[in-house]
């Protein structure tokens, strides 16, 4: 099966510049990808790159970490939500940054069971799906799908926090590829 590289959309994938980070207070969530929050006493809207329900995190008054990205073509808001604070800890909500965190953990050998594997490609296409990583080790290949787990209790993490056709499709596709002899895994990043 051929691996293809898909170009990421520039409006979605970018590193977080610490100088652009601000704290705001969550007010409401009009839709899956938009929040209203209070920034320095002014109500603003921010893009939320996370379609999960997040009911236990996005409560009125919750502290948000947002990035001022500016309005440009293809964007409706000047801000993007990066994380939300819960019990003195920020929970990463920017799902596109989850893969950056996973790649870092892979590179420094901090993912149990995946020590020594290197990232050969990001956004690799196999079958009908695009997967987060193609890893290589000693001539072997492994498809890795990364999922951010933001629904949790004291000692319990749950995924997904909402029905996910895309998530189900990825798991089914990984199972089908495994039947063809292609190795695959799912990495859950629990925060």
Kindly label every feature range from the protein language model:
Residues 110-126:
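A short acidic/basic microdomain associated with nuclease active sites
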Residues 44-54:
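Short alpha-helix capping/helix-loop boundary micro-motifs
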Residues 73-88:
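OB-fold/S1-family single-stranded nucleic acid-binding modules
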Residues 18-28:
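Structural detector for short beta-strands of small beta-barrel domains
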Residues 28, 68-74:
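Short, charged beta-turn/beta-strand-edge "cap" motif at the junction between a beta-strand
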Residues 24, 131-161, 174:
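Conserved catalytic cores of phosphodiester-cleaving nucleases, focusing on short active-site segments
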Residues 52-65:
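Short nucleic-acid-contacting surface segments enriched for D/E, G, S/T with interspersed K/R
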